[in-house]
Amino acid sequence: MANVTPDLVKALFVGFGKNFKDGLAKAPSQYTEIATVVKSTTASNTYAWLGQMPGLTEWIGDRTLTAIQSHGYSIVNKKWANGVEIQRTDIEDDNVGVYSPLIEELGRAAGEKADELVFGALTAGFKTACYDGQYFFDTDHPVGANVDGTNQKSVSNITDDSTGVTEANAWYLLDCSRSLKPIIYQERKAPTPAQITDANDEKVFMKDVFTYGVDSRSNVGYGFWQMAHAVKGKLTAENLWKAIEAMRAVRGDGDKRLAIRPTHIVVPPSLAQAATKLLERELRAEDGVAVDNEFKRMNLKLIVGDYL
């Protein structure tokens, strides 16, 4: 039986720290493909600076520009925490090896949190407002027929083929070519290890456990809805063309051209095979006839979202 001394606990937690870093390094990362990372220094960030982007008036018009600059669009940081409890008796019995994979997985989970939030924001976009007060994915974003934003009409960034595809199974086209991508990932505090190793700590005394944990602070929000299009429909050539053409047709107030050009297609894992076939095969079937696959030449980047 091992004598649980402060030096022994310290040495064990040094090893756990390596396990955590290994897991963090192994975490797959996709979120920077579709999200702009903004460093935060306060509890929340107000994105009045969205109204200062060069050429923005051409995108959203004076009316919305004034609203953003006056009232802003805020993203409040949230705290995330998780941990593994190490039983004192396991240290006494030299049974600590079981904790190494647990803490490595803790690191991996911490590293994947940004992906979970960013890709979750796509699905949540059907029920979460963006800068214009409408849901990020909506059928009635207001766009003025006149330069001053008056005589508004509704513009949709959703394609629905009425085949019963739910929001949870939607797929997305995104224009990620700009400095501000469709999703904003706001990071206040990167995943940081935390430990409870003092034998005199109340938790250690009452529960007879030490703790290796991690905490972070971050959240997600939305850039410009014009740069994203959701499809609640089957992944077919016809629907892909409809979505591409709808994105390309989006204009700002006063019928100003915005030059939206989709660069990425994001699909849930259930559509990975269909998307790969649609984008990468040399030929595709159209009305029972094999034709050249024009999507192969478009250079749409496929992202299979692990957290969609």
From Swiss-Prot:
Q: Which top-level group of life is the source organism from? A: Bacteria
InterPro entries found in the cross-reference section? Phage_Mu_GpT
Q: What Pfam family is a match, any one?
A: Mu-like_gpT
Family assignment?
To phage Mu protein T.
Q: What is this protein called?
A: Mu-like prophage FluMu major head subunit
User: What species does this protein belong to?
Assistant: Haemophilus influenzae (strain ATCC 51907 / DSM 11121 / KW20 / Rd)
